[in-house]
Amino acid sequence: MSETRKLYYEDVYKKEFTAKVLECRECEKGFEIILDQSAFYPEGGGQPCDLGTLNGIAVLDVQEKDREIVHYTKEAVEAGSEVIGKIDWDRRFDLMQQHSGEHIVSGLVHEAYGYDNVGFHMRSDVITVDLSGVLTEAQLAEIEAETNQKIWENSEVEITYPSKEELEKLSYRSKKELTGQVRLVRFPGSDLCACCGTHVTHTGEIGAVKILTVENFHEGIRLTMICGKRVMDYLNMVNDQNRQVSVKLSAKIGETAVAVGRLQDENFRLKGQVAHVVDELCRAEADRWEGEGSVLLFHDGLEADQVRKMADAVMQKCSGCCAVFSSNGDGSYKYAMGELNGDLRQFTKEMNAALNGRGGGKPFFVQGSVKASEEEIRQFFRQ
């Protein structure tokens, strides 16, 4: 068994290469293709594998097994033949930006606060970083600002393979115990870490880093962040959304939050007025039907809690069952029914069956919805 020559370490920007097919083995995934050399990075170190093609055949997965790089395809390639490999470069460069950006963030956090990166995952939209301690929003803002400053300095990223003796004299980050040759990746002024992944050669290629969210995770926190082109994609999306909001609210781009605040205040005020009107309506209906027996009411435009409130108010004064229905505007109605000291369970079961409804509650008070017209509802109650 021979070791595959790793072209991605020799030239991380190699997008296309030629190689000899050493083996092509059938497997559950399709075929395992072993080459004498490869620019396809195999999954490892928290970084997804490269994708691309071999002679136009899609490479669906890449793993390293016993020093061999295994390319998984759905089609066979003849052993002994020569193939042209092509890397999905846009994807690879995106992953390089994410991985390199994460290193700088993790290194600066470790240097400033002593916290470790205890978990790292690259997704197609964001990356997550799990830290062993808690940082405030202000501290994270400082880390983000310093990270971007390091990026814009455009320092050369250094990759070395120190001897065992040299390693003993170095202070570097590592997520696990290391055996064999150690590959160190240095981001000047921010991080020195043992890593097998692919990285940019100059920090400026990362472009920018943006921390999107932070949440508590175990004893520390989980950061969700983006780097490189993803930052521009995110900025374009946020800017487009903000522009639409500014148009709808007739507000300047930089004043949408203030405009939304005014809208919220107005909405709160109007909700208070509506609640007052509904309370008055409930009292009026309760007075209207006092002592009148069972009552069936239809009032459009009510929310579920308002339907419940009206049914409860009328139930207290009528001498039977009160059922209140309010249209949802889509051919269905929300309802609430109540009867003091009554048991509506069987009636509700029959009504839901007849009117395509669902709902339930206590024996004397139920809520739910039905898919029926007003006339169909009235017809059922006339039975």
Model-derived segments and their meaning:
Residues 1-383:
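A glycine- and charged-residue-rich anion-binding loop/surface
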